[in-house]
Amino acid sequence: MTLNGKELAAVLKAGHAMVQADGKVEESELKVLFGELANFGVPAEQAQLMMVAADAMEASEMFETLTNLSTEAKKYVAGYLAAIMISDNDIDDSEVNMWKLICTLSKFPTMNLNEALTFWRNN
């Protein structure tokens, strides 16, 4: 799957929101958050610059960008966000609510967590 810089920044911003959803930033969540950047070809030394770009993006721009992704990309992002959520082995209600909010406002296909994770792992 290929994403342009703006799309990747939107995905990273959504991922960062997932990391912060329960009020605790866990190392395991950051590992998934930044590990995905490597899968998209972003060198480790540029990860922080990408995070700065993501943080500078307005939420409305993030949602607009995510809404315009292909259906396959939306499923992938839903799984990626779910992977961040489960990475610390402690699924908090606030994380589930954040995942549902992002998926709804971004018009992602209806999926449960397990379906989203399975799609992400297989793609």
List the predicted regions and their residue ranges.
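Small-residue-enriched hydrophobic alpha-helices in membranes
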Residues: 1-123
